[in-house]
């Protein structure tokens, strides 16, 4: 199969004319993008970078749009204390070259208890950021009902008076990573060392991202782990339980709508489908709509 990237030797020389390539290897686990790691030696030492090119994915904007957004963010986020990789180069239309972050994808010993606190702290740190922090223009994501009416028209009949309503967002939209799950986290020495894959970032309701992270903990560990994350978050920042209830319905519904296009192994797909069906049904009951 043809490589989605330029010649590895040419790439590292484009970054530093003194570079000598040591290693070029694809990185496993990327569902929404092609990725490879390059290690090279230059006059100032050894460097490691990652190349990324987004793939076309159901339910996501086009690859060029996602790559452009991620490139703009990654010139800013490391300076704001967020453990995101720094952009080395953006090569239009859709190729990013990023600093390689050291860390492990597997959670530390003692999970899920060992991951709840670090995840909550990172979420709260993200959600304190907004346009006033010099972020690039981003799409907004504040209303769960628009998509839900499309996905579940049976729950939103046109003649219903009044129809189901979600309380308005109380504050300004904040920075959301847009795909906050364990697969995008790196761990080192028991702590969070990196948050990867910023192509879906937006300004929106923090409760949407909290609900998404809760889905992942539910499917990976248990419903109790998902609830523990909400309590850990609430110890650091306000939790709007009324809006969280709607996002707790939205997120599993979105996953059930799109997961067949994710390319997951059959066993993983079955596990996530079972957990998200359970979570969707529980959230519907909590909203009084089940």
Which residues does each PLM region occupy?
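An alpha-helical support segment within catalytic cores of ATP-dependent transferases
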Residues: 4-19, 128-178, 276-290
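ATP-binding pocket architecture of kinase catalytic cores
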Residues: 25-139
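Active-site acidic catalytic loop and adjacent metal/ATP-binding pocket
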Residues: 33-40, 45, 50-51, 87, ...
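Hydrophobic packing residues in well-ordered alpha-helices of helical domains and bundles
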Residues: 67, 116-119, 226, 249, ...
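Glycine-rich, phosphate-binding/catalytic loops in enzymes
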Residues: 114-115, 194, 210-213, 273-274
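Hydrophobic/aromatic-rich alpha-helical bundle segments in the mid-to-C-terminal region
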Residues: 134, 260-278
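Active-site activation/catalytic loop segments of kinase-like enzymes and analogous catalytic loops
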Residues: 207-238, 251-267
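Active-site-adjacent helix/loop segment of glycosyltransferases
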Residues: 242-246
